[in-house]
């Protein structure tokens, strides 16, 4: 998610930057930073679905595999000050593999594969997906390079794409417009997994 502070007049000063421009999040941060410097407008990106990133969200390397450097860590800290830690596609705060002594670490765990079901989950990925581990890595990076790219305000959200704040069960309109109330909505395939139909996102 990318949020512009102000009204449409600010947001219309730039074209939306999407994965069709680049799948490298560092390019998004650079584009937002350039927009902010050129216009004086404030903008931020909100990472989410860390639990479905297969170890990519809080990786300690740059997108190209080189070691994380202070420049990019500082840019990320500025562009991503907030994280959506829990939402409709599972919890991204803690995982029982990482916090085996915490009985609450297995809340709404969704850890079979990545978002599109194209890559199965491996235990080695988990430490780079969940907020608790990221906070620890952030403190370590702050000691090593003087900047913490994982210092977040955390929010919980529905991640609904219907623009409706209707998360209560008796008034739940679904995540997408395609699953608004109708008899077969619980069988609606939102994202069809390529590896195994059981990994598809339903509802």
Positions of predicted regions on the chain:
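Extended, charged catalytic domains and RNA/DNA-binding interfaces, predominantly
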Residues: 1-203
């Amino acid at each position: 998610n990318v949020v512009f502070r102000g009204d449409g007049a600010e947001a219309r000063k730039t074209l939306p930057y999407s994965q069709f421009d680049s799948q490298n999040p560092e390019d998004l941060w650079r584009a937002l930073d350039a927009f902010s410097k050129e216009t004086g407008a404030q903008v931020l990106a909100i990472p989410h679905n860390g639990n479905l990133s297969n170890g990519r969200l809080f990786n300690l390397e740059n997108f190209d595999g080189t070691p994380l450097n202070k420049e990019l860590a500082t840019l990320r800290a500025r562009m991503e000050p907030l994280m959506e830690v829990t939402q409709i596609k599972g919890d991204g705060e803690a995982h029982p593999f990482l916090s085996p002594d915490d009985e609450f670490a297995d809340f709404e765990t969704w850890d079979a594969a990545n978002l599109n079901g194209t890559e199965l989950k491996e235990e080695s990925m988990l430490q780079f997906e969940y907020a608790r581990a990221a906070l620890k890595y952030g403190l370590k990076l702050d000691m090593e390079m003087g900047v913490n790219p994982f210092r977040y305000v955390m929010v919980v959200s529905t991640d609904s794409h219907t623009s409706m704040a209707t998360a209560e069960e008796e008034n739940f309109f679904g995540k997408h417009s395609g699953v608004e109330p109708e008899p077969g909505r619980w069988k609606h395939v939102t994202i069809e997994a390529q590896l195994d139909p059981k990994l598809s996102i339903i509802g």
